[in-house]
């Protein structure tokens, strides 16, 4: 069986590339197709496969400014020659599923998320743009929406990385999706006997992560909050935390320190809405519970009352009610049980489920 894997771009190792690595292990002879490829920025496993790029990589500054060429990516995808492949697996977050396959080929799309900058986060991405940029972007985004919707029909079977994304696939493409949560690597994480008095926020300091909500809540409750990460909201958050010694914003940290902070925290605070969210599972693998806003992909990974606590409104007051319930001992979180739950999302489990599903849809 001849297999092709289509991935949006290869210029780093993020969650999508971890899924790609699993696909590479499951299909060691597969060819990879992508828009942009920087071998030095991806793993040896990915580099061991034959990688073909679209014409985007050949355009001026294509490797660095590839997102500026987004309007050309539909044409670039449709020019990729996938004749001769029996199975095509597209890995979609940026444009990937719009390839044209043989009528006899099976096309499975693993969807991390429909393109957020085209659909639900369009206004978030462009609200700070000038009038001219918004004027130019509007017709281009409209065109991309129409193209993206139409290419949903080119996919034979959708897989969503969470129940939340499955609902978005149904909403946007009017298609059902099998839910297979993405792989998480837990080898580095362990339970510690030394738990400190701080709560932890970890991730990019961008608007949708709602780190500001955690800062506001912990200014009010006076408990120690350690924040690890960086991003466009960093200066704003530091200004917000001025004069509050219990808010400790540390910026980027080495992985070894992140591992230590996970295992030593009282609980992870997760105030945003994400497509899935690896961070809560890493905290649970370290034996620590999660206090999360009860919406989005976290509903697949955190079990309310057993591995964490949900707060139901995205407000500081609602978050602090959940923190108060944790402090009052209303929940009996067992570190070993938290870790055991996290391990059900391990890479080996993901690969078993993914292979079984793909095998089931092949003729």
Which residue stretches match the model-derived regions?
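Active-site donor-binding segments of glycosyltransferases and PAPS-dependent sulfotransferases
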Residues: 29-97
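Membrane-proximal helix-turn-helix segments that form the acceptor-binding/catalytic region
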Residues: 130-158, 166
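Conserved donor-binding/catalytic core segment of Leloir-type glycosyltransferases
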Residues: 184-186, 190-226
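Nucleotide-activated donor-binding/catalytic signature segment of Leloir-type glycosyltransferases, i.e.
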Residues: 235-259
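Acidic donor-binding loop of glycosyltransferase active sites
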Residues: 263-275, 288
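Short hydrophobic beta-strand element within catalytic cores of glycosyltransferases
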Residues: 269, 289-294, 302
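Conserved acidic donor-binding segment of nucleotide-sugar-dependent glycosyltransferases
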Residues: 304-305, 309-316, 324-331
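A charged, aromatic-enriched C-terminal amphipathic alpha-helix characteristic of glycosyltransferases
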Residues: 314-317, 331-361
């Amino acid at each position: 069986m001849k297999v092709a894997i289509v991935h949006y771009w290869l210029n780093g190792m993020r969650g999508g590339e971890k899924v790609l690595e699993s696909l590479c292990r499951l299909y060691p002879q597969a060819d990879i197709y992508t828009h942009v490829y920087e071998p030095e920025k991806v793993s040896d496993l990915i580099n061991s496969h034959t990688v073909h790029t679209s014409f985007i990589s050949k355009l001026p500054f294509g490797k660095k400014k590839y997102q500026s060429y987004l309007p050309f990516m539909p044409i670039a995808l449709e020019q990729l020659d996938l004749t001769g492949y029996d199975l095509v697996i597209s890995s979609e977050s940026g444009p990937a599923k719009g390839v044209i396959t043989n009528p006899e080929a099976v096309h499975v799309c693993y969807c991390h998320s429909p393109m957020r900058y085209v659909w639900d986060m369009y206004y978030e991405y462009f609200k700070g743009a000038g009038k001219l940029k918004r004027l130019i972007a509007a017709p281009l985004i409209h065109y991309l929406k129409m193209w993206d919707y139409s290419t949903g029909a080119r996919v034979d079977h959708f897989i969503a990385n969470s129940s939340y994304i499955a609902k978005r696939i149904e909403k946007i493409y009017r298609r059902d999706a099998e839910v297979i949560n993405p792989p998480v690597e837990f080898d580095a994480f362990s339970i510690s006997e030394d738990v400190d008095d701080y709560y932890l926020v970890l991730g990019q300091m961008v608007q949708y992560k709602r780190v500001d909500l955690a800062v506001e809540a912990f200014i009010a409750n006076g408990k120690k909050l350690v924040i690890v990460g960086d991003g466009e909201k960093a200066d704003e958050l530091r200004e917000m935390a001025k004069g509050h010694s219990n808010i400790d914003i540390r910026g980027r940290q080495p992985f070894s320190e992140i591992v230590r902070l996970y295992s030593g925290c009282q609980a992870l605070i997760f105030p945003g809405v994400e497509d899935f969210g690896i961070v809560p599972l890493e905290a649970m693998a370290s034996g620590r519970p999660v206090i999360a806003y009860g919406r989005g992909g976290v509903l697949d990974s955190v079990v309310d009352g057993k591995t964490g606590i949900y707060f139901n409104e995205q407000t500081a007051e609602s978050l602090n009610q959940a923190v108060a319930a944790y402090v009052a001992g209303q929940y009996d979180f067992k570190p070993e049980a938290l870790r055991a739950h996290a391990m059900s999302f391990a890479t080996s489990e993901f690969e078993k489920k993914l292979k079984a599903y793909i095998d089931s849809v092949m003729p």
